[in-house]
Amino acid sequence: MLHNYDDFGGGKMQGAPQVPRNTLLSVDQQLQLMNTINNMVRASQFTSQLANTIFTLCAQLKTSGSMLEQSHKNELNKVFTSLRQACCRDNGQLGTPCRLKIMELVELRAMNWRTNLAHSQYYVNRPEGQHDPAPTVGIPPSATSPPTQVTSSVTSPVPSSPQPPMQFVPQNPMMFQDPMAANHNAGGIFFIPAASTWMNPLMPMPPNPFLPHSMIPPDHQMFLRQRSLNKKPNNLMNKTLQLRHEMIIRNSDSGKIMGVKGRRVAAVEQLTNTVISFQKVDSKSKERTLTITASTMEDIERAKDMIIDTIRRNMSPMRTDMSIPPPNQYSGMSSENQSIPSQQNTANIDEDDDDDDEDIKLEQTSDGKLTFHCDDPELLAAAQEALSAYLRVRARPSAEEREKKKERRKSMPLQQTARDQQEPVMLKPAKTFHGSTPNLADGLAATTTVVVASIPQPMVPNVHASGDNPIRYNRDTLMTARDTKRAPIPDEMLQEINRVAPDILIA
């Protein structure tokens, strides 16, 4: 009888009578077997009924496993989880044949329920599978019934030849070869020990009793050893030779070669076909070791040069495929020009491309930025460095300019060369600094405008202009000069004043 166990109480419930394992069960009956296994494993009831159910389920899933995989995948996952838990929780009660069935079931599902000849022969040729793998022992109706009421409730497949029954104690538990073990006859016959059995085992069963290696035929062992020795040279020859080189950089330059989220070092690895690894060092360390791995020494040298160049420029490595393509100058050609032979067109295009590659265009945007346009990245970088060097030299004043600036800083009165000559004065709004952030003053100064005020120069007598006495102004002279209409100033003088006035006002 098939005994089902509830989830909590663990009590027995009489079910439908069992059928032979070779008979295909319905889907509901197979699901009932799965639930029985789940409940018994959850209740830690590793009895003969659990072994019988596992063997029956294995025989059914060999035929209908692929169908249940599509329709009842969750139930299959649950029962396989229970089988794994049963192998971990039991203390040897399941035995080797039951574990073999579980392993066969797991491998069969891993192969998408498609068995092959090697898989079938392995489990057929196992010594544990040559006899009845699950001799079923019925559970007595009560715990006090005599052992003579033990009956078999499930019929096993008919073996090809009569075999000795399965024994709980192995013939050779210490895995020693004993020639007299074949003539030894077992005493008690039972497969899985229950809580109250009529025979106690002679010794505890090992947790995982696999077959010893000595039971493999000697000729088969020699064949396997020769085959493994023959495979070793082939594996060594198939491996590609990898070269490794170490270079030392400053720890402060690690960020330059690493880039944001490792993009720069990834670009170097992609361009040079190498693998670059960084040594893990302390943040206070001054040096750091880079390990470059590649198949050829040329790739390692190119990677080293690219790393040094990336650190020096503090820019990502340049890709050749990212260069700007030259503009097509022949898009507007007429039909007459398009009839020229292809060889002449190719030659002209190559010449024009060479000329365009050497051409650099410098543009100034509305916000005052300078923009370079060139097709050659190297030429563009050289032009950028040349312009930067020129601006640095240009911004540095010479010795003569520094002397002139010192002279202009002195507060000396302006000499009047002509009687009616008048000069404008540049009035610039004063900068006010707020707190400790002078950048705010720069922003305010950027929004202000320069005010040019015209202040007429005072009219002084000729005696002061020609004499050696210094020029002095009183209140009456200044008031008279304010009301006097001044004469227009020539353009040349205005340009000169505008050129000199900023240096004087800044000083």
Swiss-Prot record:
Record note on what altering I504D does: Reduced binding to ife-3
Domain spans labelled KH: 242-307
Localization per Swiss-Prot or TrEMBL: Cytoplasm
Complexes and interactors: Interacts with eukaryotic translation initiation factor ife-3.
A Gene Ontology biological process term: translational initiation
Phylogenetic classification of the source organism: Eukaryota, Metazoa, Ecdysozoa, Nematoda, Chromadorea
Role: Plays a role in promoting translation.
Ranges for region Disordered: 126-163, 314-360, 395-424
Any GO MF annotation of the entry: translation initiation factor activity
This protein's name: Eukaryotic translation initiation factor 4E-binding protein Mextli homolog
Cellular component terms per the entry's GO annotation: cytoplasm; RNA cap binding complex; translation initiation complex
Gene that this polypeptide is encoded by: mxt-1
Pfam families per the UniProt record, alphabetical: KH_1
Biased composition (Low complexity): 140-158
